[in-house]
Amino acid sequence: MSNSTLNPQNSTLPPALIFDMDGVLVDNTPVQARAFQLLFRDLGLTTKALPLLKRLNGMPAGEIIQHVFRHPIPKKQLDSYAEQREFLYRTLYWDKRRALPGLVDFLKAARAEGHKIGLGTGSGGPTLSYILDHLDLRRYFDVVVGKDDVPRGKPHPDTYSRTAAKLGVAPENCIVFEDAVLGEQAAYRAGMRCVAVTTSLKAKDFQAPLTTINDFTTLTPAQLLEMLAQQPDVPQPQKRRG
């Protein structure tokens, strides 16, 4: 059963395209995991970061860190841990920042074909600049929404709902690009369809994406519209486990 239907034929404009950042614009999940692992080591924790990220990727860093402790950690302390992790991540990723193959051509084609384009991410301002401005990608986005712009992160729908509102597009006329299960669930809760980008997970890990891609070399905006016409229904979000 679906909770809404995407039907571009009912609109004079093509659907808006909303992108997550980490793992979608750039393939940085292994570096993110390495930064978490170094932080956990410094904190004397034995948690394995990569499996943790596969389960919780999409959440703000502070929320991910809280999950490794059995007791609540004061927000000020979590923020400090998140800043340490951010420093490690930037140091590790400094000379490795590259856009996902085909991304720029896809964004150019989407803009040329009249799609509004937004970015909805769990990252904050400095981290956004670290990727968007270094790679000169900000020019392609009409709207950018980060963790400081919404009260709740993914899997809550706030990030994508806010992005759609700022774009001036109804949720049912938005398609989200996500690499994380929690992000996919956020899209469905917002009433949107989702394209899964398999930089860090396998296609089978996602619930019901419109399609799955390894990068943007195998997809065009026109092909996306054809898929949408064949699969217009938005899946019901799965209930969270654990």
What are these regions (language model features)?
Residues 36, 121, 156:
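Residue-level signature of catalytic and energy-coupling elements of molecular machines
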Residues 2-3, 7-15, 108-111, 124-125, ...:
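Asp-based, Mg2+/Mn2+-dependent phosphohydrolase catalytic module
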Residues 12-104, 109, 113:
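N-terminal helical cap/lid subdomain that shapes the substrate entry/recognition surface
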Residues 93-97, 122, 189-191:
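Short, flexible loop segments at the rims of nucleotide/cofactor-binding pockets, characterized by
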Residues 20, 24, 121, 179:
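Conserved G/P- and acidic residue-centered "switch" motifs that form tight phosphate/ATP-binding loops
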Residues 118-119, 196:
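Hydrophobic beta-strand core positions in alpha/beta domains
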